[in-house]
């Protein structure tokens, strides 16, 4: 089954136009526009390459059929060429299937402790480190925008910005978008003197980050901006000035804080980026019932019973309850080895999309 010619022609024309734009030095004077064009080009590249392979295979098949009428050696090639054409048509159909429009986006990720007190905060910090190590494996940059630590060095809450450094169509969101929800841990807490296994939980929220704050309509009159003395790690002198920023979006009640940059101006800019990401997600929730259902699957209350995944330390086991994924390599997972799990989640999501289409 082949894609409509007009749709393919439009994509080929767009790909060629983007190729010309990217070759023009003038485009790269605007880093934002250049990155947007680069990401779209990267998204179209496999479609164009697969289509060209398909056209070549179709030509070979047609020639083999014609020549095979008089030459058995050409006729023998027909079944293999037919299989190649079928395979390429399936690949092209998959590439042309609607995909998440945010897959190329960077993200804002929040980790929050829940039931379990100090142990929950320590586990929240373990989750944050897990995502940081995963990002490092992929060459992504991570910035801790805000953090509130517990007495033992855990995270009551933390906000991370995770950004890719390239123009891949499969960006940070495409890999980490399934992480939103309640994560449950079973282990012996450091505060447990009797050696008993306890269960606690931490929550994760993930938002695609708009490339520009201006993409999201934010009325300055809807904001209350407070500044206060930072307790973060923003550098020398950070505790002697009111450099931390708290922004409250009055219509929604969303509160964003940022204190780890060196200046009040930088903290405000970062906080506005996080606010834009959260408002964008909220708007998409309200515009789509499916998005609302997806967001409802993220953390609403950090309740141990509402979990998407369990981390069992005594058995070195991780279990994702949405897809019945189990593995006994928890130590490696916490060190950022998440791709097998993420591949399984992406495959399940793709299958669900195909079934619903």
Curated annotation (Swiss-Prot):
Q: What does the UniProt entry say about where the protein is found? A: Cytoplasm
N5-methylglutamine, modified sites:
236
InterPro entries assigned to the protein according to its UniProt record, in alphabetical order: PCRF (IPR005139), Pep_chain_release_fac_I (IPR000352), Pep_chain_release_fac_I_sf (IPR045853), Prokaryotic/Mito_RF (IPR050057), RF-1 (IPR004373)
Q: Name one GO molecular function term.
A: translation release factor activity, codon specific
Its ancestry begins with: Bacteria, Bacillati, Actinomycetota, Actinomycetes, Mycobacteriales
Which PANTHER family does this entry report, sorted A to Z?
LD18447P (PTHR43804:SF7)
- Keyword flag Cytoplasm: yes
UniProt PTM comment:
Methylated by PrmC. Methylation increases the termination efficiency of RF1.
Quote the gene name from the UniProt entry: prfA
Keywords, alphabetical: Cytoplasm, Methylation, Protein biosynthesis
The protein in question is named Peptide chain release factor 1
Key word Protein biosynthesis present in the record? Answer: yes
Taxonomically, the superkingdom here is Bacteria
The cross-references to HAMAP family, in alphabetical order and at most eight, read: Rel_fac_1
Q: Species name for this entry? A: Mycobacterium sp. (strain KMS)
Q: Which family does it belong to?
A: Belongs to the prokaryotic/mitochondrial release factor family.
What's this protein's function?
Peptide chain release factor 1 directs the termination of translation in response to the peptide chain termination codons UAG and UAA.
Which is a Gene Ontology cellular component entry for this protein?
A: cytoplasm
In terms of NCBIfam families, this protein maps to: prfA (TIGR00019), PRK00591.1 (NF001859)
